[in-house]
Amino acid sequence: MLKKIFLVGIGGGIGSVLRFVVSLLIVRIRFSIFPLTTFVVNLLGCFFVGILVGLSLKNNWLDENVKIFFITGFCGGFTTFSSFSLENFQLYQAGNYHTLVLYILINIIAGCAAVLLGYILTEFF
């Protein structure tokens, strides 16, 4: 059990640092009121989860510890629902209701599509 906790912690730390680095890169190209950083990070995380799940289900390619490290740890630290929720609140407060609805819908639809795409890509491995 302690090993699994350690794997989640290390994976989560790496994911969090990488999320911060990605956000620094994206902030430089920010072009609208659309919260692009969280969207990109969550989309990448969903895509990666899809790949991991696909590999896991296909011939048990991934060991349980590898899944815990990457899916629960890394992807859990890399993606962020709290930032997504805060940005929704900020859009609401600013009166950007159309952007708010669009942001919520695009995140949910694109996130599910990214998981599916990642999963489908594992069919070629």
Swiss-Prot record:
Any Pfam family matching the protein: CRCB
Domain of life: Bacteria
Any GO BP annotation: cellular detoxification of fluoride
Residue sites binding Na(+) per the record: 76, 79
Subcellular location(s) of the protein: Cell inner membrane
Catalytic activity: fluoride(in) = fluoride(out)
Chief localisation class: membrane
InterPro entries given in the database record: FluC
Entry protein name: Fluoride-specific ion channel FluC
Organism: Azobacteroides pseudotrichonymphae genomovar. CFP2
Encoding gene per record: fluC
